[in-house]
């Protein structure tokens, strides 16, 4: 679920997903079009693509199971669809963490009209 995604971002990237990525670049936040503007925006592009491959459950609302083992988030549970959502969220949170140093405030609340280029395929 989106609430769990926020929790994973806080755990892994040590920052608020809603605040930092709720409206960033062309892909972070609701919707997405154009080309990713930087590495953090690309994290969101890949996350959108990952959610797009989920067919048997709802990534935005379905609750998944995960645990922490030696500080590492491990997705679990018996439902393969929910596990897939968890993996999408976990990979994105790791991506945000790994690209914090190139996060650029100029892409915060980036106008959608700057995202008119043709999108690359997932």
From Swiss-Prot:
GO molecular function: calcium ion binding; calcium-dependent phospholipase A2 activity; phospholipid binding
Record-linked PROSITE patterns: PA2_ASP, PA2_HIS
GO biological process: arachidonate secretion; lipid catabolic process; negative regulation of T cell proliferation; phospholipid metabolic process
Record note on cofactor: Binds 1 Ca(2+) ion.
InterPro entries attached to this UniProt entry: PLipase_A2, PLipase_A2_Asp_AS, PLipase_A2_dom, PLipase_A2_dom_sf, PLipase_A2_His_AS
Positions annotated to bind Ca(2+): 27, 29, 31, 48
CDD domains, per the entry: PLA2c
Catalytic residues as annotated in Swiss-Prot or TrEMBL: 47, 89
Chief location bin: secreted
Any one of the GO CC terms: extracellular region
Functional summary from the UniProt entry: PLA2 catalyzes the calcium-dependent hydrolysis of the 2-acyl groups in 3-sn-phosphoglycerides.
PANTHER family the UniProt entry points to: PHOSPHOLIPASE A2 FAMILY MEMBER, PHOSPHOLIPASE A2, MEMBRANE ASSOCIATED
Name the UniProt record assigns to this protein: Acidic phospholipase A2
Species, as recorded: Bothrops pictus
